[in-house]
Amino acid sequence: VCTISRMDYISPIVNDIAWHTAVESLFDIDCTPRCKSIRTILCELGRIQNHLLCVGAAALDWGGITSFIYGFNEREFVYDILDFVSGQRFHPDYTRVGGLKNDLPCEETFKTMVKDFIHKRLPKAVGDLETMLNRNRIFIDRLQGVGVMTKQ
């Protein structure tokens, strides 16, 4: 169902998996534990890339173009993982009702890519984003004191 991943261009794999999971639920179709695990990992990667883009885009709106690029670069690595798994970077169309289009091409490579992202690339990117934004005078001036709610 190639139109599903196009509904959310920010994290298309999440829509793809959500739609197929909903159909499986309607028809009482169960997936293998391996399929569920792969889907969960891909959804989490999609969620993380979504947050990276969100923080980067917010920083861009508030004067931090470098932060946007940092978040975007790591998002690209998630697309590399999707490309490895499904053969497509942006609209993976990887899930099917009851399973996946195909198994992982190489489980060890997949694990290495995911571990590299989670344990090395992501912590560095988050740290860099925090450092850039928490010390960016323009960013701080535009946000500090905005939307403050008092007890009253």
Predicted regions and their residues:
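Active-site bordering "gate/hinge" segments
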Residues: V1-Q152
